[in-house]
């Protein structure tokens, strides 16, 4: 939110509370993983349609790439989505990304599992309280693999364990400047 306000970009946020499967998913991942991921993918397509129709620049807090490359893949690797269902999901994903233009920049906020657990606790969403530490560790591993192989657009990686964009003005100012510099193609190297 703060980043979009400072940059004057229109924000598009992940519709967490809209997913009718999410609470069921966190209580029984095996039964609801495919349904939940398919919902997120179709919802993300709707958001991308809005992004394409929006005037000016936008900020999106979760991309279609993350849905498929991290969350759905993690569930498949944990045998929570069957190979048949995962194949259908991947077919749909590949069609979608072929039709969508890539973003101008991906900002990756790198965080440890401890930081993620702390942030989840501070949000106070009851359905997130039971997320296993191991699940977050698996997601983190897949995020690192994905971001290191992502080539569709420039990537800005920001370590965020000690980052506080809400309470520390210097942090938000620095991140805004980094984003503006990357979008404008400006890079300064200090040797």
PLM feature spans:
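Walker A (P-loop) phosphate-binding motif
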Residues: 1-3
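Conserved substrate/cofactor phosphate-moiety recognition/catalytic segment
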Residues: 5-44
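Short glycine-/polar-rich loops that comprise or flank the Walker A/P-loop
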Residues: 9, 100-105, 151-154
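Hydrophobic/aromatic beta-strand patches that form the interior of the parallel beta-sheet core
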Residues: 12, 60, 105-107, 156-158
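Conserved nucleotide-binding/hydrolysis micro-motifs of P-loop NTPases
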Residues: 16-19, 64-66, 111-116, 162-165
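Flexible phosphate-sensing "switch/lid" loops adjacent to ATP/NTP-binding sites
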Residues: 18, 30, 37, 47-84, ...
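A glycine- and Lys/Arg-enriched "phosphate-lid" helix/loop adjacent to the NTP-binding pocket
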Residues: 70-144
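NTP-dependent small-molecule kinase module
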Residues: 118-191
